[in-house]
């Protein structure tokens, strides 16, 4: 009975204590609200603060004692500087509205942040709190995402916090695609390049849109070409370099500058060509663009935009064209006539022909071998003399779409819903490995750093990114990204890919240019 009475007494005491605390809190809030109301009524106020951010001014009648007790900045202002004798004090601040909210919090008032989106108010608040010498919370800063128009404000805040291993990745994550990176010092660029993806993915869609994505699947920008008419029978494209893409649509050929989003040139179109152009290669040394149509190859000089040569050597439709990775004075064509033709790119004469059933082909990394694939086997030929070097049976259930030379000795064949990996020269991993894929692919391309394999699906509006850097035992980590329109079909045709390209982003290009410039300057000073 005594224990029960004791418990009851303790419960009553707790209730009384809680009630007392609530009364005290209510009284405190009431007194703070009353004190704040005095600022509105100008009762007992002894200083007028004018907050000026350059765009707007906010005037507040306040109490020095409250300001000085809550903020060291105001304590010093009222005791150590000439403003201590002034009744009206003007203060230049980052934002008058946010600073006024901070001062209102000295009176225990809830702040109204509805005038700004959360990210903007948060950044402005850090700037204003820092100005007043008050602490700020950085928990949200680590995950902040700002729109393009907020990037400069983000940089202003990083200037306050400092450029550290914590803040530089935040800058990298929020970098606008077209930002003028020359504003950055070289030291910052050297740090940013560690965190920024190095390459952009370009997808040329069948609706006449050139879309840009980063490696994480985020769309960066789009360029709308004038080829948006459903009467167009075909639409295809080829990347010339990191700035130019040539776009074919019916009897029009335009060279687009993808940096400036403008048509840089129009190419002369061949007379009486009734079949579509399908396969392309670019020869940087003589600035020639080569394309195939039916049995013929066509050569444009991009210096003059003129068609300079038409050559017919194959006896059936040409199904592929590839330029040597080490010497663009040579390229190879394959056709349905099973002819594999090696060309001199200076004279446009055939140097050598080999006969072998072939669906797709690629050069080795050294440029000394040709690797050809059909649904039954893989063959390797010596480029210089055409001798047969290697053969391996594979027996695919469908003809392969393409073959990619991923790195020295490692090749990827794309067929049906699989990726097949094999090695040449043979080694202990020589047996082929099949990786099941979410869909059939029509195109595949590696980023120049060989870290990512981007595959373009044929039956869905996705592209897949395989992370080669974490691949173990030939198993890739795959991420799929929705891209909206089908990028692997052409109007009225099902079997042609339009365009899947990789370009360096502007930060990577700037870093390489600045690094080269610094090396040249070093050579000049220290020959």
Swiss-Prot record:
InterPro entries according to UniProt: BTB/POZ_dom (IPR000210), SKP1/BTB/POZ_sf (IPR011333), WD40/YVTN_repeat-like_dom_sf (IPR015943), WD40_repeat_dom_sf (IPR036322), WD40_rpt (IPR001680), WD_LIS1/nudF_dynein_reg (IPR050349)
CDD domains xref list: BTB_POZ_ZBTB_KLHL-like
The organism's place on the tree of life at top rank: Viruses
Keywords: Repeat, WD repeat
Sequence ranges of the WD repeats: 215-266, 272-310, 313-353, 355-391, 436-476
SMART domains reported for this sequence: WD40 (SM00320)
PROSITE patterns: BTB, WD_REPEATS_2, WD_REPEATS_REGION
Occurrences of domain BTB (ranges): 45-115
Family that this chain belongs to: Belongs to the mimivirus BTB/WD family.
Name by which UniProt lists this protein: Putative BTB/POZ domain and WD-repeat protein R783
Organism: Acanthamoeba polyphaga mimivirus
